[in-house]
Structures are given as structure tokens and as C-alpha cells.
Amino acid sequence: MEALKKIAGVTAAQYVTDGMTIGLGTGSTAYYFVEEIGRRVKQEGLQVVGVTTSSVTSKQAEGLGIPLKSIDDIDSIDLTVDGADEVDKDFNGIKGGGAALLMEKIVATPTKEYIWVVDASKMVEHLGAFKLPVEVVQYGADRLFRVFEKAGYKPSFRMKGDSRLVTDMQNYIIDLDLGCIKDPVAFGHLLDGTVGVVEHGLFNGMVDKVIVASKDGVIVLEAPKAG
């Protein structure tokens, strides 16, 4: 599995050229993309500026010598490469297994080309087998948890050891065990309108390409263009 993740990450790095501002994703597959960019910066003199999606990725990129800028200092990003926890046939996805969904979505939004790197196990018919992360403010989190519980969403607080995990943005994550999300777009809108929810892990209609690595090789799936 790790070998497939590495293949997907390295393949995505081929889309990066001199002068680009690139979004650096978070997670076990995006890790290999960042590593390959670091190698190219060092060995090939690749000239890029990175924008990171988590403190973990910032630390990795700094260690590799990749120049970084804050999201607040740029107007657009040429290319962002990130992982995904599930991707359906309509190019909707669930992200946030690494607890970085808010920053990942903030970086994805001004991106001209958004690429996900996955192994074949992440491609699914319907989203929802992977728990859906919902980032919530700490104030009122337990009340919101009860709302989700009453709605039948089977919520659980993301933990780190014996304590609730706190994200880079100082929020909690409530994971929803939904089984199958029949209409990801509608459910995303529902969560968007829920007071106390900062962001959720449904990335609907955002991705442009999905690089899928399997034992049979690598395929690049292109999302249909809107309109």
C-alpha cells in the first residue's frame, strides 16, 4: 500500500513546473508528493513557492528546503496536490482523516488545478463508509454532538490519547459514521448551514484530476468541466 501511495505522490509532482505557487497537502499520500517536490528543489533547482495545509506539512516542507508563503500573502495557487479518504464516481470526496480539512479546503478554494492522489482502495461507489469529519468550535460542541446523535449520525469526538483532538485552528472534530451518504451535495449544504460547524470533510465538485495508483499501474481520472 505504501508503495502505491508513493507512486501516486511522485506522479503528481510531474505536473509541477518552475515558477508555480503550489498547495502542499496533508496525509500519508500527499507526504510523498511533498517529498518529491523537496527532492526536485534540491537536485534540479526547481523554483516553487509552497502553501501548506497543516502544521505537519509546514514542518515537512521546511525540513526539505521548500520556500513557503502564507495563504494570506497570495491571491491564487497554480496547483494543489492532496490526498483523499474516499472518492466517488461523481468526483465528490471525503477528506479530513488527518484532521486538516479546514486548512485543506481554504487552500483548495483559490487553486487553479486541484489534484487528489489516492490508491485504488479509496475509489468507492458511494461516500460514507469512511467516517465524515466535521470541524466544530469548542463552544457548544457537546450540544452539537447531541444534535448529531438525535439525527442518527452516530457521532464520535476525534481523540488524541485520552483527550479530544484539537485542530491547528483550535477546534474539535466530530466524526459522523453515516455508512452511506446518498446525496453528498445536499448533506454538505445541510452541514454548511449548521451553526457551530466550522467546516466539514465533504469536498464536492472541487477536484480536477484524481491520480489513482493500483497494482496494475497509475491512471489519471479527469473530472468533467462544469458547464
Curated annotation (Swiss-Prot):
Pfam families: Rib_5-P_isom_A (PF06026)
Summary of the function given for this chain in its UniProt record: Catalyzes the reversible conversion of ribose-5-phosphate to ribulose 5-phosphate.
Keyword Isomerase: yes
NCBIfam families membership: PRK00702.1 (NF001924), rpiA (TIGR00021)
Entry's EC annotation: 5.3.1.6
Stated name of the protein: Ribose-5-phosphate isomerase A
Keyword Isomerase applies: yes
InterPro entries: NagB/RpiA_transferase-like (IPR037171), Ribose-5P_isomerase (IPR050262), Ribose5P_isomerase_typA_subgr (IPR020672), Ribose5P_isomerase_type_A (IPR004788)
Any one GO BP annotation for this protein: pentose-phosphate shunt, non-oxidative branch
Family recorded in the similarity comment: Belongs to the ribose 5-phosphate isomerase family.
Organism: Streptococcus pyogenes serotype M12 (strain MGAS2096)
GO molecular function ontology, one term from the record: ribose-5-phosphate isomerase activity
Catalytic activities: aldehydo-D-ribose 5-phosphate = D-ribulose 5-phosphate
